């Protein structure tokens, strides 16, 4: 059951109220989530997880939901949340106090911030509550040492780069004032005193040097993983200057798309589109000038019914139809699997695993597999490569009109070839940006003179892609 919250609607003016205008009624009520859980139990689910991808479920809300789930379901209930906005540790303790069967945690060096709370902290709470954990904490301590090294190795992908201070609950003694915070948190959870609970839990996290609550994530209402993914990708695209604008646009884009829950893949679709919209604004273009193919499919209805209906006028603007249109499986076409003649005539996807990778993540897999085949070929043909000479040709000046990249990304697919006649607004190329596919159209009618890029290559915003003769 994907936990999410209603967006913050703009405050209505007195004139709007007098005209009878109202903001939409709440969608994501306790009953909404319970009904979803009951539906899945009826379908044969063995367990229900309340999955809070954004870390936005506060302790008071889980204190309402957990007894409701436990009294209406016959199967175990699990709780999954993140610490990004500062609720995670307090919410997990609240869930434990109110009867949860299972909670999701992370091991110390990978815990806190955009991740789940540390199992070591939950272990201390459970010991104080007289709850036995079916976990070998000695093994956890050994694993944690290995994870420290692994996280160091992954530093390039670490959006936080803040390690908690070393701690082992089996061998280290807590200072009396910190131990008192644990007792205060338990008392606050039992009495449903959310303010005191959060104060105690955040003091515990601060003592161990876990990341502080991220206010930007709290306001934008996004999952921690979605946030770190967006940061990492914007860094790769040298576009970190639009991060704050993109984050602020997420609630707006999500509402326009029918309030989908921000969980994979819809979290990435909405996040990438918010980036597109921020780039549009930066380039003085209307929002939604550039939309990913996946966002079009979401708005069209191909990912299924959204919690609230999409405005037909918006659907027409984005997807070219006013009607919700489910995905037609009979029209599915597998990804092309070309022979790479330049790398020894091997196929791009050589086995079932690679074919599946192409089908699931075409925008990423194509570039990944091409580089893999190239590296393998170069490793076995070093002598031949050394003997080859390179014929350097003088670059021909551009005389026609040019289709440019509206954003940084990778060339996923070129849809035209030299000599093709194209019309204004025709799709000429697919650009992969933030793992989403974006159709790039020609602003001109004419004949394709030259393709200025290659599939699989990275381009910057404003890069020249295709030359068109008018």
Each predicted region: which residue ranges?
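Alpha/beta enzyme core
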Residues: 1-75, 93-100
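Short acidic loop-to-helix transition motifs that present clustered carboxylates
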Residues: 4-5, 31, 84-88, 410, ...
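Structural motif
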Residues: 51-53, 78-82, 106, 406, ...
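Catalytic alpha/beta core domains of metabolic enzymes, predominantly
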Residues: 53-284
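Short, proline-centered helix/strand-breaking motifs
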Residues: 76, 358-363, 412, 439
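Terminal or standalone catalytic/regulatory effector modules within metabolic enzymes
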Residues: 187-398, 406
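Structured functional modules or segments
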Residues: 396-470
